Structure formats: C-alpha cells, structure tokens
C-alpha cells in the first residue's frame, strides 16, 4: 500500500511553492492545508484539473521560414526594375501516435472522465445527504418546539391534578411525538437518498454517453488524419517557392538515401521518380527503419488556396518583347509560352526576341487580353512639348550639286563662292558633303556639294533628301555617266526638281545636244523639248553662264514657294559629323525650321547635348542660325550618324531618356534581325566555315566617309573571301583600336587620320599591318589586292607534248615499253600523262621511264623517237597516243 504524502512534501517533490499548490488544490475543489495528506486519487484529480486548465502537450509544431530574392521586371523606357520578393514558408509537423495507442488513450481518457464524473456525483451525493440530514434535524427541532409550546399551554389549563395521574399520559404522548419525528426524518432521508441516486445514475449515464461520443470523434479524427496523409498540401505562393520546396525535398531525399545507421548503409528500393507524387515521397520518408513507429509527413500549408481557374490578365506588349518577359507578364512559366508558340508553328527559345504580332497571338491564345503599346510615347510627348512659331516666312532654297566624278561640281561651286575648296580635297575629288550659303544679288542660296565617286551613294541620297533643288552637273564632253544616272534616280526618289548645268561648254569637243539626247532617255526633258527641266550651259573655268544658273535656281525656288517658320525651336538634319581631337564630337547641321541658338538642348538620333559652340562654314563663331543655314555644332554626347534628324527640345533629362531608348531599340531590332533564321540562308550558313575572312579596323575623319568606305569594302566580298569590318568609327587611331585589331587579327586602315603614340606602340609590339590613305581609290585597290592573296589559286592543265605509239616492247624491269614518235611539242620525264585510244582517254598516270637509244633522258623534242614506260600500266597498244601535260598555277584576282 502506498504511503500518502503531505501537501508540503508533494510541493518539494514537484519543486513548486506550497502556497501555489494549496491554491491549485482549492481551484480543483479540494481543500487542503500544508500538513494534510494527499491521496493518489486527489493527485489524479489535481492533474486532471491542471490539464484542463493549461491544456495538454502541443500536438503539432509549426516552423516558419522566410527567403528573400530579387526579381528584375522590365518597365517602360527599356529599363528593368528590381523587385524584392519575400517567400514565406510554413511547415507544420503534427504529432500523431499509432491507432492502437490512440484507442488506448481514448479508452483511458473516457475511463478517467467517467471516474471524475462518478467522483463528482459521489461528492454531490454526500453534500446532499448532509443537507438532508441537517434539514431533518431542523424540522425535528421545530416540531419539538411546537409540541413543547402546546404542552406548556395544556399544563397551564390543567392544575391541581395529581402527579401520578399525569405522568403516564405525558410519557405516552412523548413517545408518540418522538415516533412521529423519527418517521418524518426517515421519509426526508429516503427522499434525499432517492434524489441523489437518480442524480448519480443520470451523471453516470451522461459520462458513459460522452465516452462513447468521444470514441466516435477520435475514430473520425483518425480517419481524417489518414485522409490528410494522402492529401497534397504542396501549395506555394509562386513558382519560386515551389522550386525552392522541390529543391529542399530533393536534398532531404538524397540525405535519407545516403544516411547510415550502425555503420551499415541503408538501401532503398529503386523506383520511378517521375511517377512518385509529393505525398508518396513524404510517406516513404516518414516510415522509420525498424517499422516501430511513424514520423508523420510535414505538410506545407499556405494562407490561400490554389486558384481553381486561370486568371485572365491585361498584358501590355511593346513592339518587341522576349519570350521570358511575355511569360513574366502572363505569370506563367516560360515553357508554357514556348509550347503555345510551337502549337502556333513558331519555334523560339526563352531569350529570343519576338515581334508584337507574334506575342499578341500567343497571349490571346492563352486567354489573356492584349494591350498594344506604342514604344515612342515618350518621344512623341517630348516632341509635342516644343515651342514652334506660327508664321511661315519665305526662306532660301537648299541646292544640292550632283553629278559624275570629275564633271566639275566643286569647281562650279568654287566659282560661285569665289574660293578654292577643291585644292584642299585629297586627289582633287570631294569626299565630304560641303555645305555653304552664298549671298547673291537676287537673294541667298544654300549649296550642298556631294561626292560624285561611286562609293558615296548613301551620302548623295542624304543630300537629295535634305534639298529643295538638285543641280545636275553634266560635262558636255563626257555625257551621261553612271553617277549621273544615279543622281537622277535620287532626285526622282526625293521628288526634287532638277536644273541641269551642262558644264565644260568651253571645250572644243563639247556636245550639249548629245547631253540633252542622253538625258531625255532617263526622263529628264528640256523645256524647249516640252519638258520641265531647265538646261543651262556653263563653264566653271571661264565663268560663263553662272548668272543664268543662279537665276534658274531662284526662279525654280519661287515656283516652289519655299517657306519656313523662323521663330521657335529649331529642327534640322545632320549633314556630316566627325570627331575632332580638340573639340570633341562635331556635327554639321542644316537648319530647316526655327532658329538654332547657342545653349539649346539638341537631340540627334542616338545622341543629345547642349550646343556649346556654333560655327559657320568659314569657321566663324555664330550665336544663332535660321532656316537653310548650315552650321557646325559642338557639345553632343557622341558623334551622331549622318542623316539623323536634329531637334531642339526643352528638357535635357527627357532628351537623354529618348536617346537611351533609341539606342536600346536599335539594339533590340538588330538582335531580332540577327536571330531570325531563314530557310534560304541555311545552306549558305553551313558553308560559312570554309570562307576566308579579311578582318579590318577602319577609322575615318568624318562619318560620311567611314560609311561610304564600309559599304564599298563590304561589296568586295565574294563567295570565297569575305570582308569583315570588326571596328569602325571617326577620329584618330587609338590604343583601343590597335588592341581590337590584335585580338581579331585585323589590318588597320586610316582614312585621313593618324595613330597616336600609344596606338603605335601596340602596333609595333604586335606587328600589325597599319596603312594610311587619303584617296578612296587607293584604299579600295589595296584591299582588293589583299583579298586576292587570300583567294585559293586556280590550277590549269597545259598540254606540252604528244607522242604516237609505233611499237610495243617488253622490259623485265618496266613491263610494256611503248616505242613512240614525238609528233607535237616536247616529252618530259616525271610529268603526268594520258593514254588516248581513238581520241578517248583510257588511262591517266605518270611517265615513269623515258629513253632514247637505251639512254635515260629527261626530255625528247618534236620529231624524235623514244621509248616511254607508263607507271603501273601495261596495256599499251600500237596506234595509241600518249599526251604529256603539266599543271600551271594561276594567281586569281578580284575584279
């Protein structure tokens, strides 16, 4: 039998204050003091109360983890925005015991609750019995008091009677009253006992019913937990969280496979990982080695449920977009977008740039609404915020002088300007666009002098685009030439009227009528023949007809009614640009509208900047320039491309954004063009590995010359040798250019530029090929020679002799020997030969033995007899012809 402990010893045993333990006993309904003993039953009652009060041990453990990452999201303007992503993962481990332990625990819990109910019922019964007993005693006391009161009244009424006579009835009455009180007490006690028993039965019945209900609830909970085990709570907030969880699962799975117990590696059954679900893997991981228990799988529960249907989004698509960006906007994986494109018949990679139409088809196919965005919204907003004047005033005509090379364009313009510009051009040919404005008696005229060389096609096209009138210079002694025809085509494409200047009219061999006849074949009809073109006979040397030419130009400009807004922000076109060593990027701009002032913010194509200085064509500083005035401006961020539109804007920050956007847009379009694979180019690309390449680094003094040279060099490419310009630009040859040439094994060509000291050191150290040119003819000719050296040589067979077989002899050393007569040319030893029978080649081999009168000889001439031994051939017959030839290597050139 267990010895009962006191409250004080129990407090010391469980290490808690005595006052707190007494208070806990009181809260449990057990009144105890420090010295009172505690039974086992009271301990259990206290424990049950504490469990109810504080709850049992936690049945689950929840772990939370946060991971942070950065995602780049494309935004307007070509920039990407970094977004911080926080993935919150919550994993709950539920502590579930085995079904047998749960059932035993359930039964024990039910029994414990029933005992507690019975104990509470017994306590209630004892309390009620005490109350009934107390009530019965009080009732008996009241009745006894009433009887005593009645007896005293009777004693007062009955007097003077003998004591003996009254004693017997009083005793009998007292016995009767006591019997009545006992009967009443017994009835009250029975009533109380009956009520207590009924309450005890009812409480026991409720306890039994509650135990049964608890058992059913636990059984249902067990079934629910089994269902939970098979459920997949693999719900994640995003594809990043899902990838992180799968990676973690794979790591845990690998650790479980390689984990050892007792020094012996545990082996797992190989299975098809592709067919396993997430719940299967967790359940397999939960089973312990000995099979004695389970560690229940952890379930990841998020704060929201997986969407049941696809969310349709508004997808904003620009002119170009990559597959990854499109998938990001639709919140799907890139593989799904690629699958959708494959269904539509388009093959793409995740980083490939696709156009707007393809992206729209894919997005609509996947059920999203497409919003097409114009990429130049920022540009349009910047251009609309310009202060332009309202009143248009007459302006000077912009005249472009065009024609064939050496037909006298620059000389004609020199006479008009009374300067000697042609002497400054290398080789006497124009290699830049010269922009000049001259004051005449009848008004101002702006002239653009374009190169006539074949290489400057694009430069001439730019001149025609920026002009109002084209003066076509044709030499009277030379007639219509290829560049003359090209100039006519440029003028027609730009829809610009032509004024024909028939130059060199003072030469004796001049024939103006032939010029008119030839030009009429190309649609340029003189006015006297019913056409629209004015023909003026001029001589740039003698100065004849110059005034008539100027009057014809001004007359044509009056017909055109040329007007421009003089006030407000300026706009124009870049005629030429170059990099000056002391001044930086310099651009020649022809103002077309408004007034360009010093300090204005100019946007030129990909470049922008504030105008720091302006100069006219004579090099004089100016502060403003109106319409039709060409000026050189300084202060741009870099060298703009010739032909770019120059516009004055208000905000330098917005100008910078537009320039950067244009650069990014140009790069995207370039990449999209490169990645577009065409079927017709497939076989050409397959043979690219066999083609030799001539790598060139080209530096020029101005942008136009650089562009023209690049175009001419690329046209020299053939099927066997290709010209590859690895680097080009304006300005001097720098160390960077030399390093690039060394890395790409290229030659360096400088056109009117020189290499600096650091570049020369690199060129000498790397033994690079550096060449300087000032005339484009020489540059192209030398590149042709270099390409010719890279061509594979051509081999040609030349017949040097012919011999007729007259007889055949047998030799033990050489086999069949043909006795021959040389009929043509010479027969040489060790040369390749052909054996002809009836003029048909039957064998081709090598002449092994050549003898004359038993002597070995190296050569036998025409008309002499000899013996010929053919190597590895014995079927020589009388009447055959032996043809001796040699292979000649012919050096090829590029035409």
Curated annotation (Swiss-Prot):
Residues 503-506 are annotated as: G4. Residues 50-217, 232-302 are annotated as: Disordered. The gene is infB. Its main location: cytoplasm. Residues 110-217, 242-257, 273-286 have a biased composition (Basic and acidic residues). GO terms for molecular function: GTP binding; GTPase activity; guanosine tetraphosphate binding; translation initiation factor activity. Residues 69-83 have a biased composition (Polar residues). Residues 394-563 form the tr-type G domain. Residues 100-109 have a biased composition (Low complexity). It is found in: Cytoplasm. NCBIfam families: IF-2, small_GTP. InterPro entries: DNA-bd_dom_put_sf, EF-G-like_DII, EFTu-like_2, IF2_assoc_dom_bac, IF2_II, IF2_N, P-loop_NTPase, Small_GTP-bd. Gene3D superfamilies: P-loop containing nucleotide triphosphate hydrolases (3.40.50.300), Putative DNA-binding domain, N-terminal subdomain of bacterial translation initiation factor IF2 (3.30.56.50), Translation factors (2.40.30.10), Translation initiation factor IF- 2, domain 3 (3.40.50.10050). CDD domains: IF2_eIF5B (cd01887), IF2_mtIF2_II (cd03702), mtIF2_IVc (cd03692). Residues 539-541 are annotated as: G5. Belongs to the TRAFAC class translation factor GTPase superfamily. Classic translation factor GTPase family. IF-2 subfamily. It comes from the Bacteria. Keywords: Cytoplasm, GTP-binding, Initiation factor, Nucleotide-binding, Protein biosynthesis. Residues 449-452 are annotated as: G3. Residues 258-272 have a biased composition (Basic residues). This is Translation initiation factor IF-2. It comes from Serratia proteamaculans (strain 568). One of the essential components for the initiation of protein synthesis. Protects formylmethionyl-tRNA from spontaneous hydrolysis and promotes its binding to the 30S ribosomal subunits. Also involved in the hydrolysis of GTP during the formation of the 70S ribosomal complex.
